[in-house]
Amino acid sequence: DLHDYCIRHPSATYYLRASGDSMADGSLYNGDLLVVDSAEKPRHGDIVVASMQGEFTVKRLLLTPRLTLQPMNASWSPIYPDPDELDIFGVVTHIIHRPREMY
């Protein structure tokens, strides 16, 4: 069952619709459905939902050599957040992508 496959912590998991193209080279596209687990501890290399100064973003989290929110699109620049101003709202555990538009 898809629910059992995608959701490890039901009370801490939510869905989010991706918007934009900053992660397109990482196979995360505008309109994709993200499964986000707020109970998972973010690790180096995870794709996370983060907020800085009230602005939300989805990026790859790099912890070393410097805290970085790394886009996966060469047209976008990395973000080097102040750790005191960065809030991580969850780890993206699955990406649901339609290979074609459904009409």
Segments predicted by a language model, with ranges:
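Acidic/glycine-rich C-terminal interaction modules and beta/coil loop segments
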Residues: 2-103
